């Protein structure tokens, strides 16, 4: 293969800093950074290279860092939850944790001087944040009910873990994949409802039968960015589950060697596929693999609409249930300790996070125990039967903590949804997604109603506003929504949403 890495004279700021020093090099310097303090350390290390360790400097809360974890398949043990809760608790009101759409956790309020101690605690608990930021493969997504779903086709837990271990060198850091042209997302679906949002990942594996054998059809190139949003397209390949890791590795190597990072607005995998065409891209992947790929199965098994997972659901094992709780807009505070206790008292000590819904799942015992669980005070906040708008509400972090966000999102989203639920009767859930900027972390393009933050003018003054998206669909026949109205002031949004819910989604005034 011919390298298209740009000449050094054309390197942009990010490619230049990567060429000067691998981001993983800061792993050995964390103790020094902790002693120096954030104000005295090298700005490039602080603002950029620390992200290879999952540590993010935030200009909007200087001195308080964000820490992004790696939680493969979104599964945590009660012991791990306690370790994370202890980290958040030490910072009082400044500390909190957000569930992300990968599904992962981001811890906020972190002090740089505490990082070495925090990382030692993580290592003891089997946790890591390695390579969770910048131009790396992000958290690997799998089915939130893998291994316990009565209707699942493939248990994705082991595959997700193997892919992560390959990418991160078993959590130690892997220089082979620490210098991709841009960030990279991988998802492995094991159920019929596309719970992983396969279409918005750079590589997605969806279950499919070929010649009577269950494996995966492969999609490539899905992504969101400020410049362009594209759904993943078929690679025309079917793989045995045993070959998933090797195919991921081959695609990543092709992307690393031939993808162009010179223009960061045109450096995601789909841009390379567009430049080459799918036939050439597939051929390059086959060359890296060392053998031809099988052609795709005629159809995949994504046959259902997106399941909610909130509430009480029977597990694969007779007599056992799992309970899905709503964490409103994905924000966790002190209740993390309660979640750990509940997971142990009523289940096997395991908690799971979901992709779109941002929920917590607790595997439970027979129905007699479920009845006791439902009486827990925590379930007044994290409900098993929330309203039909709040249960599907998704929001990015917003301007409270993110310097890219153009508007405040989480608090505004919750306040507006409460008002709408108090005024309207709904027949079904409506998925409303908020994102603070065009980077689309809140994924408005997959929502029934998507709201993207922007700046608008009202009465001659600049104010916070949104662009309105509609038509997104998840599950079978997934589609990306489109922008239908631009520049709505947030103060004017409520009547617009109210009318949309009535006219398009069957809501009725109370």
From Swiss-Prot:
Protein residues bound to [4Fe-4S] cluster: 396, 402, 437, 441
Reactions mediated catalytically: 6 oxidized [2Fe-2S]-[ferredoxin] + NH4(+) + 2 H2O = nitrite + 6 reduced [2Fe-2S]-[ferredoxin] + 8 H(+)
Annotated InterPro entries: NIR_SIR_4Fe-4S, NiRdtase/SiRdtase_haem-b_fer, Nit/Sulf_reduc_fer-like_dom_sf, NO2/SO3_Rdtase_4Fe4S_dom, NO2/SO3_Rdtase_4Fe4S_sf, NO2/SO3_Rdtase_FeS/sirohaem_BS
One function term, GO molecular function aspect: metal ion binding
What's a GO biological-process term for it?
nitrate assimilation
- What EC identifiers does the entry list? 1.7.7.1
Instruction: Tell me yes or no: is Transport among this UniProt entry's keywords.
Output: yes
Keyword set includes Disulfide bond: no
Q: Which residues hold siroheme?
A: 441
UniProtKB keywords: 4Fe-4S, Electron transport, Heme, Iron, Iron-sulfur, Metal-binding, Nitrate assimilation, Oxidoreductase, Transport
Per the record, the domain of life is Bacteria
| Family annotation (PANTHER family) | FERREDOXIN--NITRITE REDUCTASE, CHLOROPLASTIC (PTHR32439:SF0)
> Family per UniProt?
Belongs to the nitrite and sulfite reductase 4Fe-4S domain family.
Q: Tell me what this protein is called.
A: Ferredoxin--nitrite reductase
